[in-house]
Amino acid sequence: MFCVIYRSTKREQTYLYVEKKDDFSRVPDELMRGFGTPQMAMLLPLDGRKKLVNADLEKVKQALSEQGYYLQLPPPSENLLKKHLAEQGKQSD
């Protein structure tokens, strides 16, 4: 199984995985409007891989099979105050 990964022009660190190059027919229109003009980032073989860097391989394969696309969102930003307070043994409100 192969997939094509596209980078969003509207949202940093947001990627759209589809089964075929330039085939967004199964991607909802609203998602495409929010995603912007897709910029191809890479063609990726999924078979034989054990993992992906920022996505769960099995979830990607399942989403591609069931809905025809997978949307990778940026990781949540780190809450430095919460981390600092935890290191100090305190809780944030």
From Swiss-Prot:
Residues 1-85 form the YcgL domain. SUPFAM superfamilies: YcgL-like. PROSITE patterns: YCGL. InterPro entries: YcgL-like_sf, YcgL_dom. It comes from the Bacteria. PANTHER family: PROTEIN YCGL (PTHR38109:SF1). This is YcgL domain-containing protein KPK_1976. It comes from Klebsiella pneumoniae (strain 342).
